[in-house]
Amino acid sequence: MRETLNRLATVLPRFSSSTARLLALQCALRADRHGQVHLPGGLLRGMRLAGHAVPWQELEHAEWLRCRPTGTGKGQSGVEAQLLDTDTLMPAPARSHRARAAHWALHPVPLAVARAAPPAVRLTALVLAAHTEPDAGRADAETLTHLCGLSQSQLDDLFDRFIRTKVLEAWHCDGDAGEIHWRPRVTE
């Protein structure tokens, strides 16, 4: 997961929204070896993206994918796209591993947040979960801001929000090392 997040942070423009980044992640993990992807309508509704054209337009504008027209018949709901950046697909783990990763990205244990949470919150929780060992996590502050597409102050605000909403038990920034450390809340 970390590798895919890093590749996406590298190829997507810095100004890409959290929504577009979450969408790009699902596309990268669900694409076939030719870069073709179909995101079903149910998945898009679950991600709260059904009917939202802006994140797709962002990814098209970045020349990362091209949306393809889909049929309107029964069973044809969703969006089909062709990924244009084949580097995102290489090296491609087995399809079953990518499918599990795509599902985990929707519910990143141990830092899962509500599906109704704003995209920046969901993306940051996912990035933190990908950098969390069983009882603690840490990452370079600059890496986190790059992966989340946020400024340091925005990231600090989200860490504080995770404390208030009981997603995290604690966090601190080691200014000398440039690292952020956190501890997920243990649920019983």
Predicted features along the sequence, with ranges:
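Winged helix-turn-helix DNA-binding recognition segment
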Residues: 30-74, 133-184
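Short alpha-helical segments that sit at the start of domains
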Residues: 1-26, 99-130
